[in-house]
Design a protein with these regions (language model features):
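Short beta-strand His + acidic residue motifs that chelate non-heme Fe in jelly-roll/DSBH
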Residues: 82-83, 104-110
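Conserved short histidine dyad/triad with adjacent acidic residue
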Residues: 51-66
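A short, N-terminal "cap"/entry segment at the start of jelly-roll beta-barrel domains
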Residues: 1-49, 85
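A short hydrophobic beta-strand segment most commonly corresponding to one strand
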Residues: 113-128
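Short acidic-glycine-tyrosine-enriched beta hairpin
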Residues: 85-102
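Short, conserved beta-strand element in jelly-roll/cupin
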Residues: 68-81
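Conserved small/polar residues in nucleotide/adenosyl-binding loops
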Residues: 138-144
Length: 148
């Protein structure tokens, strides 16, 4: 009900799995529902924002990415696999993760699930280095996966 209210207030954004500059934008599909609890368009000078993320699909491709800012993520529904340089970990409800802007990761969902998180974005401008790495951590096999 709360999410429906946010939608009616114009606080929901459906994020697609590719942007309009992508050569196959015609194949774009919903990737995440994003609900803004504070700013729909956060000013660069404001130090944080709070959002609810409802994940609809795995992160794109095989590589990993980071964010423009440090962040905190709190899993409030479902769960997901997070792959980092340290391995592949199950993030269950109640999990709280603190990440720097330089932490590369990817998120993969269990089929048929729609995990939800509270996402607290920190200040802009703290990332050093590239946004993504084409490096794939898919070589991590089940024995290296850890449930946290």
């Amino acid at each position: 009900m709360f999410l429906k209210l946010l939608d009616k207030l114009g606080r929901k954004k459906v994020v697609l799995d590719r942007g309009p500059s992508h050569p196959r934008f015609d194949l774009a599909k919903p990737w995440m529902n994003r609900y803004y609890l504070i700013f729909r368009h956060r000013p660069k000078w404001f130090p944080f924002n709070i959002l609810i993320h409802e994940m609809l699909a795995d992160d794109h491709g095989d590589g990993v990415h980071n964010h423009l800012f440090p962040y905190i993520t709190i899993v409030i529904r479902g769960g997901y696999w997070e792959t980092t340089k340290k391995g592949k970990f199950w993030r269950r409800p109640g999990y709280i993760g603190f990440r720097s802007a330089n932490t590369h990761h990817r998120v993969d969902l269990k089929p048929g699930t729609r995990p939800m998180t509270i996402f607290i974005a920190g200040p802009f401008g703290l990332r050093k280095g590239p946004r993504s790495e084409s490096v794939s951590y898919t070589h991590l096999t089940l024995p290296t996966m850890v449930q946290v």
